[in-house]
Amino acid sequence: GYDRGTGDTKGANNDRLTLRATNSWKLGQKLSIENMISLINGRDRVFSSTPRYPMIPGGGKNNLYPYASLVDDEGNFLSIPRFYNSSFLERANADGLLDWTYRPLADRDKSTYKSWNRHLYLNFNLHYDILPFLKADVIYGYENSSSKSESLSGEDSFEVRDLINKYTRIVDGAKLYDFPFGAILRNGDNEMQSHRGRVQVSLNKSFGDEHTLNALIGTELYTRNIDQRSSGSYGYNAEVLSRKSVDYNTIYNLYGGLGYGYMTPLDAYSGTLSRTLSMYFNGLYEYKAKYGLSFSARKDAANSFGTNVNSQWNPLWSAGLLWQVAKEKFMQGADWIDYLKLRSTFGYGGVQPAGALNKTVIGYVGNAKYSNLPYALIGSPPNPGLKWETVRTLNFGLDFSIYGGKLIGNIDYYRKKSFDLLSDDPFDPTSGYSLLTKNVGKIATHGIDLTLASNGRFGKGYWQSSINFSYSKNKVTDYRGTIGATSLYLDGGRTLMPLLGKSLYPVFSYKSAGLDPVNGDPRGYKNGEISKDYQVLATDSLQYLNYHGTALPPIYGAWNNTIGYGKFYLDFSLLFKFGHYFKKKSIVYGSLFDSWDGHADFAKRWQQPGDELVTTVPAMQYPNDSNRDLFYQHSSNNIVKGDLIRVQNIRLGYSFAISNSKIKGQLYIGANNVGLIWRKNNENLDPDYLDLPAPRVISVGGNINF
């Protein structure tokens, strides 16, 4: 297949070509071979200097001032502040330096970024029937993902002009340029290769009419190697394919008292190698095709745990019971029940620490800028006590189908206990690290998963509908980690932050006592009394904060539908999330004054007595009190319920078939990220996208099968 799309910025485009083929051969009565190949080639192109939100001017400013004009009434591109103030630019202009103004729209097409991507996946399966009831499989999978990129910043781009001007010296009225004229070329070459090998033996044997045994045992080895290389050139000339040399060892005086600087090499290299080895067994014994006993076991090892075998290997197992209720004699009269199955499992699973190792990892990063000697940085400190997180699960399930498959359902109730919970824990800052992944405690979780699917017909039409519903609640029952500063728990539940007796991703806030009716100051509570001592309020103990709940939705799911009539069909899906909280953004006056970082809540601020009855946004105060800002920013006024219902996607299609041939196809038009149809908050906010809304994607396409 082939598809072409446009990006989210002007001039951006991408192409993708996909190929997939599957083949099978039977070599005699017992031996067969299957293989699959998948190839994806893609290309992307963007103007890398295209201004994006938020536009950060620099120089301590984190946002562009409101109502900034990028184009005048006659269509001319206008400049905005970028790193330097106007008086500094006037001086540079008087000294004859290059134009140092930043015009975002003029700079848009001065720099380009191109990338070429390829993804190849091969899978081979050698299948051999040892005996009629005993089969063996040897499976090999190879994956290769590579990308090449080229980023070119033109000589007249702001990036290059900025560097040329900064490295310009004025000597006796003459300009000396230490940075070369020309473009900056950056190349990237990334490759990922993985190999997966599996040997598996399966058994399917009946003993008489009442006993059946299904089992498989196997081992799997997986390796993945990631290699990343980047290079670049200064003073690049695309017409003659030349570049200019620069001195990376010299420390230069920058123009206008901007300090000192050195030219950074554009070459970098990195790579990772990971290996995992697994052994597994699955078995099911059935009696009279009604009662079942299952057992599974698995043992995994990973090279991230060094050479200690006991740390590498993590044994996992589960056992289960199965009862086909619909096959019992007392159910024979219930013809409307297709099947009814009860099941239960108990076992242990595991979670490997992602990116955390029990050995010290260092990375060699080149030569030091002053001594020119090679040096290395500690990528992660030693963590010898690190273990897998173990999860014990007890599950009860019910599966059913009624009225010839018109209604199919699955219901699961589970209880989980996590041991050796993995979490980033506050660490001794004198070590150079503020957080370290540790095993910090235990979590108890219980929940319900429900799936219902229906199939109905009406005349020439049909309606297929399914709903997935999940409820999950967790609580930290044991915590051996470090309780950090109060400020660490005020991010609105964006980080894990386990606490005894609380859910994961907890949402805390300062208790608000409303606004002062006299001057609009925010107020809190100190020792049970209304207070405006912001320094004390901002450092209040965690136990006196409001605990709202979790930022992770306890209730979530989706409703998927396909309605067809004749050759036309309509697909749509709704997503829902209930029971969670999030922290909304609001005005922070210090950021407004110092960094031009404003917010629409500025219009809702307290301005006169009586406003405290209709707003929670404090009055503007200058000079600003940073502790006052901090208290309001993290107060309960900015904690909002996150319940929502969203139309995720919708598609209208037409299916066709060419008579007297095997050619079939579809034409369709659809949209993704359609939008919210209900939210619980009154702020008109989308809890999933607090900055920019998710882009709505419109697609038109088709496919043909020969």
Regions found by a protein language model. Name each.
Residues 40-94, 149-171, 224-249, 340-366, ...:
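A surface-exposed, glycine/aromatic-enriched loop/edge motif typical of exported proteins
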Residues 548-585:
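Glycine-rich, aromatic-lined ligand/substrate-binding cores of catalytic
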Residues 2, 37, 574-576, 651:
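A mature extracytoplasmic/lumenal domain signature
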Residues 105, 158-161, 168-171, 577-666:
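Extracytoplasmic gating/loop element in the C-terminal half of outer-membrane beta-barrel translocons
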Residues 7-8, 304-305, 582:
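Extracytoplasmic/secreted cell-surface and envelope-processing proteins
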